[in-house]
């Protein structure tokens, strides 16, 4: 018969085996598990030590735990996921303590290199602005609608706007100001400003504002005098210096697209020396890639065209490319010459509307756009796929 020592050995071995079984299956903790741990105040931890895609995955997998029994999350603003994530990221941004190494940017994208990707329809993501920054996307986008001549709501369709929670200031300009203040606290008066990428603070985030409303002059006025004013006053927006005839790069570069005003009289508020009479222009036009003129070297920093327009210009058709599964040598040669022309004017380029299905076609065309054509910003909805293609 086995002695007491032998029985204990067998029992311990059994417990270890059971624990290993559950561990190997990757069982997610239940709400009961979280209930036992709620007193540890996990939702008050300032830094989990995760960044980029790992941070996003952690929040998605542990959302019940992170928000459990927190009264402040009972009323959602955007979504439970967004509200909890934003609160974590910006938790210390309002603090008077100046410590950029432990900032929102450090939590979002430390050890994540910026990638030449445009976060297309960024406002549709579960985490507008934050998800793109976590992946390192160096360009983002917001469609804006003028509501009651005083609010810029963000959304793709006018029928589904929320002028209270889903606004330009709550989703984009407000968080950007907090984030940038946090990493520029050590010398806020310096002309040198740190940007939104931890690994590359000198990289400017392209911020496309897509005008949707008919009254684009009023929309532009709201942008300049209300939504971007604090960013301008803090020195965070790239601008064209009218006196020096050069572009001065800053952490955020605003690009107007869609139904935007093109008149310099509107862009400069009727002044010869800029909107605020400071000899600075704080917004750039999304230049038409197929009809560029020398003037765009001062008015723009980027030029755009749709994939279908580009293929038509090159004597082809986007359906032919899709059926073939790739661009042929003639199409590549033609498109590359167009992009080279933009580069001669020191403009970045973006091609939107490329095939979105199937996945192998998307990957092939995307690689050709970046590597064969030499386009600067890969326009994709799927940031995970984009990160694997760059």
Curated annotation (Swiss-Prot):
Top-level division of the source organism's lineage: Eukaryota
GO biological process: lipid metabolic process
Gene Ontology molecular function, alphabetical: phosphoric diester hydrolase activity
First and last residue of the signal peptide: 1-26
Record keywords: Signal
Record's keyword annotation contains Transmembrane helix: no
Similarity annotation: Belongs to the AIM6 family.
Name the UniProt record assigns to this protein: Altered inheritance of mitochondria protein 6
Lineage summary: Eukaryota, Fungi, Dikarya, Ascomycota, Saccharomycotina
